[in-house]
Structures are given as C-alpha cells and as structure tokens.
Amino acid sequence: MNDNVAIRAEGVCKSFDGKGVLKGIDLDIHKGEVVVIIGPSGSGKSTFLRCLNMLEVPDAGHIWFHDVDITEKKVNIDHHRQKMGMVFQHFNLFPHMDILKNMTIGPEKLLNLPKEEAEKEAMALLERVGLADRAHSYPSQLSGGQKQRIAIVRALCMKPEVMLFDEPTSALDPEMVGEVLQVMKDLAREHMTMVVVTHEMGFAREVADQVVFLDDGILMEQNRPEEFFGNPQNERLKSFLGKVL
C-alpha cells in the first residue's frame, strides 16, 4: 500500500435486515488529508464511517489501516481503534464523571499514562479550546457546543493518527456550530488526518481536500471541493447540491 495512504476502503459492503446500505465502496484517505463525506439521509455515510474503525463490521470488502487489513479476524482491533479518535453526534461523554476525568480515563487505562501526566495533557487541550475553567464541571452543566468541543479534545488525549467525525454539529443549536467547526479547522491546519460526515457545506468547501458524495450506498462522486461544488458531474449530485446550497 502507498506509504501516504492512512486508510483504504476496498469494496466495502454492508446490509441491515437484507437491505444493502453500502454497495462496494472504494476510497483512499491520505495522511494529513481532510475527507468530507456528504449525501442525503440514509445514504450510508455514518455506516461507512463506523466501518472504518470496525464499529460496524463490513459484510464484504476490506479496510486497510496503514498496512494492516483490520477486517481480518486475527487482528487486535482494539489496538488499532486507539489510533482512531471518533467524535459522535451526541457527544458520548460519561455523565457521572467530571470533564477532566472524562478526558484522562482513556490515557490512564489504555496508554498507561501516569495520572499527573494525563491531567497535564488534558488541561493543555482544554486550554486550547477555551474550556480549562470547566475541568471540574459535569457534562450536564455544559452547553451542547461545549460538550462537543470536550468530545473532540477527549479523543485527542489518546494521541490518534486519524480523527473520525460523525455529524458532529447536527445536534447543536445553530449558534454553537461555529465554535465546534473552528476546533476542527484548527486540527485540519495541523494536518490531522480527518474523515468528516457532515451537512456543513461551508466547512466542506473551506477545509476539505476531498469531498465525497454517497447516495444509496454508492460513492457517486469524489473530487476536490472547487470542482465538486463548482462543476459536479453526477446528475444526482447536481440535484442534491441544488437543494442544499
């Protein structure tokens, strides 16, 4: 596999209750690249994202993470998952732990980081997103935008090589979307490899290196944002963009 490819999907298929949700997806995600996946509801975007770290196991096809086929049964998937941060639509913070504990439990238990070092790194990340003063707050005391910023830096505490975002702003009030997108833009500027499922077309235009359009489980079009939005080739994509732009 090309040294510059972080993740490769080959012929990925997935069905639920006999209905094909992914129908042979091929996609290369290069190191340091931001790939944004868009498409209508039910097109398979989130399922595909969850296949990339095997939260959903493909029925057919392969997922390569660096040079390892992580769809192989003998692979220790937990070892590879630690290198892929994932941010969900509904934050998935532990409600009974304060923010600092939410952030340090992973590094302490999985990376064997000493408590003091884990807390120091967590506080530096909280400082970076302007939430150091909320270290001892609980998730229920935070706004949606604050929770999602915490969810992002919590994932970063594990020092991932890739970040996967599953509609990170869709559960937020409109005025909170910008603060979360800003954190993601900052990550992109630092050349973090990112795969983002989103409805935020402005983010896709501004930040993506590649934009991918999925519809009915099929990768219909993939291109750089200026071509993808400015000169779409696929008729279904033209129709979709006409409704959302």
Predicted regions and their residues:
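ABC family nucleotide-binding domain
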Residues: 4-225
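C-terminal boundary and immediately downstream tail of ABC-type ATPase nucleotide-binding domains
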Residues: 215, 222, 226-245
